[in-house]
């Protein structure tokens, strides 16, 4: 007789600390957030071999890996922050882009995960085009170029600060949070958001989430102007900039959904093994 233990230990999480949601913490985040942004639009002045569509493809692959491995929500945006900062300073051949993406996920998971991704597992996701030793060597290269500044501010750092100030029922906040996290992940796949302050992306994502849910009457109704005014006060964001950011976020979601539906209609959806993301693909899976 063979006994199988199928119990899985849940991830141990600390009790929420209200001190971390005080206004002084929010102000500190707003003060330092721009230190961790790419210093230039690197496709124009640094990268000669890498094109925007290549970044989008590797970003989508990274997102699929993070989703399949059930990584914390912060891991993917943080990994993309590392990737963009590295590419903003180091000319990189396109043949090394997936290796760079794997290294960035490796570093981000070490910072945010209880059990980080292993080098061997990440190499499997590259279809073994990257070797573990190569990944470990590049880890040191990336760390050096980033000057070991890994604790970057991401949009997720602002989500709880924003949600706790909203006039919404507590049970509705989890739904708003989930939608906002989806928008943040989508923004990370699109280079146009790479140089936006994280607070702007977080505020726009929450605004887009609430507006979308209000159409389905899932949350308390607020006029668009009232919601925008409230959000700008929380993160000290310019009203016009926030409106423009939110419109761009909604456009990115609409475009990705239309693209997915078109792929389904044309019958071009891949029929390969869906259990392992080995090749970068277009953005198509957004769980709302």
From Swiss-Prot:
The keyword Phosphoprotein applies. It is found in: Nucleus; Cytoplasm; Nucleus membrane. It comes from the Eukaryota. CDD domains: CYCLIN_CCND2_rpt2. The keyword Phosphoprotein applies. Keywords: Cell cycle, Cell division, Cyclin, Cytoplasm, Membrane, Nucleus, Phosphoprotein, Ubl conjugation. This is G1/S-specific cyclin-D2. GO terms for molecular function: cyclin-dependent protein serine/threonine kinase activator activity; cyclin-dependent protein serine/threonine kinase regulator activity; protein kinase binding; protein serine/threonine kinase activator activity. Belongs to the cyclin family. Cyclin D subfamily. The modification Phosphoserine is found at residue 270. Interacts with either CDK4 or CDK6 protein kinase to form a serine/threonine kinase holoenzyme complex. The cyclin subunit imparts substrate specificity to the complex. Pfam families: Cyclin_C (PF02984), Cyclin_N (PF00134). Its main location: nucleus. SUPFAM superfamilies: Cyclin-like. It comes from Rattus norvegicus. The modification Phosphothreonine is found at residue 279. PANTHER family: CYCLINS. GO terms for cellular component: chromatin; cyclin D2-CDK4 complex; cyclin-dependent protein kinase holoenzyme complex; cytoplasm; cytosol; microtubule organizing center; nuclear membrane; nucleolus. Residues 264-288 are annotated as: Disordered.
